[in-house]
């Protein structure tokens, strides 16, 4: 039997008097699994000049020493006091009880500027501001920060720009510029994460919802729609009422941004849409590939601790930190699984670790040296920290409590309430010791007359990497599976067998390699179909796909009651989930006051981070996913692929303007009208030839209808001209501008003239004069042409109407040498 390579559990290390420092460090290093070490070497363990890397114990010593030194250098503590704090900081990390987030682990004590994981930057509505923010963002990305941006302040596509007297390209075009720029920057062993948010009342919201419909597009951003109570009430209470966007304080119709096949903005059309219809578009995106997510802006601002700074409009990349512009938060998480002793929580130890962690993260702020000074200044003003949790699902496993139950939610509420309360008590103690955050006056804490060191304290981050090296479940998420393969952004794969489950089987004397247990785990990741296992084990060891979306949402809402900021959580759906189920989930989460909502339907992306099944069948991820996205679309169901790429004609505006041309054809004078859209591009075409109901009139009408549909579907006019120009008919005719071979050729020539030579009349009177001149000039000129030219001057050989062969001039008449057709009879 082949040996399994899986993550093994290691009991939390406890410092004892009998261990020397060297022995203690050796024990710490030995406590990490193969997977954990692989990931730590890639991301967190510093490299020495000789090419070797530090050990995990050395990492923790480096971080603990660097943060404890703050107490001496800034707050005047003695060396003994600082050493005591250093030992406490080291212990909570070495015991896997608490872990700071990645940037803190990587940079503290390493001679590298200390920066926060999470920052929000403004994107305001001037070109100078847009590119100033991009410059600041590039510097912060390079340093290792994750960034959030609200693109809701940018004017909609098609709006006038004063400086250039042109029209705005719209927020999505600038989002693409940011995305491309960030794709070039790679942070210390990791790709930069970014969040783009647009409020639901922005006129370009439809364009935003669909901007990541093709997998691999805008791949350096998560996107979320900022919903409001007004919008959700309209969805649930007035589903048929029109929905109006808001811009500059005015209610206007939302619009669809029109793009050419190469993606360039060519215009926009107003939409008559209800809130429910817009909501359905959002749901469709979430159902299709998990994006966009949703953030509840009104709920976030109801709990905004710094109302004097204005409303919050954005979050960090993972959505758990609602921040003002230039505000920051450093994250860290308590591993709840480490506090279970004999099936019960050790709340005394949890209290100690919580308070130590608050001090640790407060000290991180004093070391900040962001490449953008405004960020460091704001951090000193608010002193936000994001103390969260991980290992919750494993904690429930050890306690024998089912995740998707009232008991599970009660445990979650109790432990989060305890941590939140202890964190606040510690912040009050630090305020007495070191002073309040400088923006305390005007905050919610000043109104409550509570002296606080930190504006906000708790959050729940996804903990993807730090939970990997502590071998525990992520955040408040249920385990994805009891056996799975995790794939990171660089394509590296890590196999995991849940250590708590493996230990539970061992305690009961159950052999995992018998009765098809391991085979079922590899196949499905779940034990729900293993009836040979005791029922209490099957009830306790549930995984994400065993849990209904409703229970996922209820758990998130239970935690949200006791979290200062927000929670990063994914609501997992099976692949068979319907759009209606996703929609119901969004409504439920809003009603339960969840601040953020991310839904994911299993298998709806070509590449996903966690996978169940044989590793050989799991797709690898590389930086080339963007360029490969189109090829990978063949994996989509055919109907979804067709929907994704189907062209839809835009709605015709009620009023358009254009020009009418007259051209002589072999069948009489053809009058062609070309109408333009608001940007001056051809929108539709009409042609009149002969009497209504005649053969040539019906042909020209049919042709013009198809051309108009193509134009309104954003097909390039040059493509249409190329297809029609040069088509030969049996009755060509000469004009002063050359040969007109057929009706299609005549229409193509007029379209070409319209887009390449026509100039817009200065006013309506000039337009009328132009039309009159156009209508009379060809007639006068044709008389002169007739006198000077003969049939031999047709130039290009027209086609025979009978067989398609060439017509030639014979005996004063056009005749076909192939079939004998003669125009003269």
Name these PLM-found stretches.
Residues 797, 813, 821:
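Residues immediately within or flanking Cys/His clusters that coordinate Zn2+
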Residues 800-803, 816-819:
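Short cysteine-rich clusters marking metal-coordination/redox-active sites
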Residues 14-86, 163-177, 187-190, 194-304, ...:
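Conserved, charged catalytic cores of large soluble enzymes
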Residues 34, 319-322, 361-366, 450, ...:
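Catalytic alpha/beta core of large soluble enzyme barrels
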Residues 684, 690-772:
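Phosphate-backbone binding interfaces of nucleic-acid-interacting proteins
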